[in-house]
Design a protein with these regions (language model features):
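Conserved short submotifs of the Hanks-type protein kinase catalytic core
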Residues: 82-96, 100
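Activation-segment/catalytic-loop signature of the eukaryotic protein kinase fold
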Residues: 78
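Protein kinase catalytic-loop region centered on the HRD/HxD motif
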Residues: 120-131
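Activation segment signature within eukaryotic-like protein kinase domains
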Residues: 115-116
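AlphaC helix of the eukaryotic protein kinase fold
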Residues: 45-66
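Conserved N-lobe loop of protein kinases adjacent to the ATP-binding glycine-rich P-loop
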Residues: 31-38
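Protein kinase glycine-rich loop
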Residues: 16-22, 27
Length: 188
């Protein structure tokens, strides 16, 4: 049994179940007792609390917090305590674009165009706010039942207008989707 399921986080978020596990965090479905709504609570994995990579988790909350777009998941709250760090987001009742493609096989061109248009509008909004996602892939795109797309997981996003450039000896991104420049660890 997970240590958060069945517990209340910060006296407000009643954690109901795990809905996803990523490299940096575990995502839970929860009930916000104050605003009386279902939310997603993304909790940083305990082993990463003191890790330098934790900076990515903070980047995600900062990146999403400045955006307000119907095709980008909304952030409602963040918490950065010593023992638990989390982001509270809009709960997306849907499936990933990857799951959808696996079920459907080849997408009809009209669906592909409709989804791509929404994704591009979301990315344009992010770019207008000075944010580069850097990990766009079908697993980071959610599809609602009504066909609405939501771009998620800004964990390795960076602010494009910042003075600091990302140049390290590490590749940033998902191996099947990163550009050759990212794979070489060059500036992005």
């Amino acid at each position: 049994m997970d240590k958060f399921v069945g517990k209340r986080l910060d006296g407000r978020y009643e954690i109901e179940e795990i809905v996803g596990v990523g490299g940096m965090s575990v995502v839970y479905k929860a009930h916000d007792e104050i605003d009386d709504r279902t939310v997603a609570v993304k909790i940083l994995k305990e082993e990463l609390l003191q890790n330098e990579e934790f900076r990515r988790f903070k980047n995600e909350s900062k990146a999403i917090a400045v955006m307000d777009h119907p095709n980008i998941v909304k952030v409602y709250d963040v918490g950065f305590g010593d023992r638990v760090q989390y982001i509270v987001e809009e709960y997306i009742d849907g499936i990933t674009l990857k799951e959808y493609i696996e079920r459907q096989g080849v997408l009809p061109w009209k669906d592909a165009l409709y989804f791509t248009t929404q994704i591009l509008r979301a990315l344009q909004h992010a770019h207008d706010k000075g944010i580069v996602h850097r990990d766009i892939k079908p697993q980071n795109i959610m599809l609602l039942q009504d066909g609405t797309i939501k771009v998620t997981d800004f964990g390795i996003a960076r602010f494009a207008r910042s003075e600091q450039r990302t140049v390290t000896d590490k590749a940033i991104g998902s191996v099947h989707y990163i550009s050759p420049e990212q794979a070489k660890g060059e500036a992005t």
